[in-house]
A protein has these predicted regions:
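Hydrophobic "lid"/C-terminal helical patch
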Residues: 23, 160, 228-232, 257-260
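NAD(P)H-binding glycine-rich loop region in Rossmannoid oxidoreductase-like domains
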Residues: 62-99
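Conserved mid-core alpha-helix of short-chain dehydrogenase/reductase
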Residues: 67, 107-110, 159, 218, ...
Length: 261
């Protein structure tokens, strides 16, 4: 167990989401003081589970600067998970995608600048690599964005790295295909796994697009959460950093199906 500093108060944006819930629970278990901002109603079961564990919960939108200020009051660190995460939705409505991701992140930056935030951890995405065929992917290969979602994530990275005060540590984490307990089959994080499980348990055959030879790098949400917790706890982090959050192990869709069944 990582022992947190009880005086270290963390604002988790998107804390009621798939990764956010696991992170908030881990932080609370390690004695961090946690504040959450999410558009999910405080009466929702996911929000209630966090409230019952001791999180300060704020039903708000990161696009509203006053909501960010209220949720972040007294916090020294920020984990910015809140985002529009659907690639198809970003193509269908790029303006909304940018409004949530870009304007929301600008509000986080403004809040950090005005409140002496020590450290910001940002959830980016492997989507910023586009169709780059270099394996393994290196952080410097990013920028070949193929969707408004990817473009917005890459722009958020640039904004965070360029607009934060030098005293604030910025850690950009490019998540690959995150999976784990509590994942919705309709989610945007490696949804193939819960989709397979859902169809199998309901007596249906899993749907495979193509010949199933396409591969992905899957990483457990527990590993993602442990990494973020360590970054928050470590006072010797480098000033800024951009990191791939993956396992460097490729698993084909066919192999994944064999593992699940």
């Amino acid at each position: 167990m990582i022992t947190g500093d009880e005086n270290l108060r963390v604002l988790v944006t998107g804390g009621a989401g798939f990764i956010g819930r696991s992170l908030v629970k881990e932080l609370l278990a390690n004695n961090f003081t946690v504040s959450v901002i999410d558009t999910v109603s405080s009466s929702d079961k996911n929000a209630q589970s966090l409230i019952q564990l001791g999180a300060r919960y704020h039903n708000g939108d990161i696009r509203d600067s006053s909501s960010v200020e209220q949720a972040g009051s007294g916090c020294s660190h920020i984990v910015h998970l809140a985002a529009q995460t659907s690639v198809p939705a970003s193509i269908e409505n790029p303006e909304l995608n940018d409004d949530i991701n870009l304007r929301g992140t600008k509000n986080i930056i403004n809040y950090a600048n005005s409140n002496n935030i020590e450290k910001v951890v940002f959830a980016s995405s492997a989507a910023v690599y586009g169709d780059c065929e270099d394996v393994p992917l290196v952080e410097e290969s990013a920028g070949d964005c193929r969707s408004p979602y990817a473009e917005s994530k890459f722009q958020c990275e640039q904004d965070l790295l360029s607009l934060m005060p030098k005293e604030t540590q910025v850690h950009i984490l490019r998540f690959f295909n995150v999976y784990g307990p509590g994942q919705d089959a309709n989610s945007n994080y490696a949804a193939v796994i819960p989709s397979f499980i859902q169809r199998i348990t309901s007596g249906q055959s899993p749907t495979i697009f193509g010949d199933g030879s396409q591969s992905r790098d899957f990483i457990a949400v527990s590993d993602v959460v442990n990494l973020i917790t360590q970054i928050l706890s470590n006072h010797n982090n480098p000033q800024n950093g951009v990191y791939n959050v993956a396992t460097q192990t490729e698993t084909s869709i066919n192999e994944l199906l064999r593992i699940i069944t």
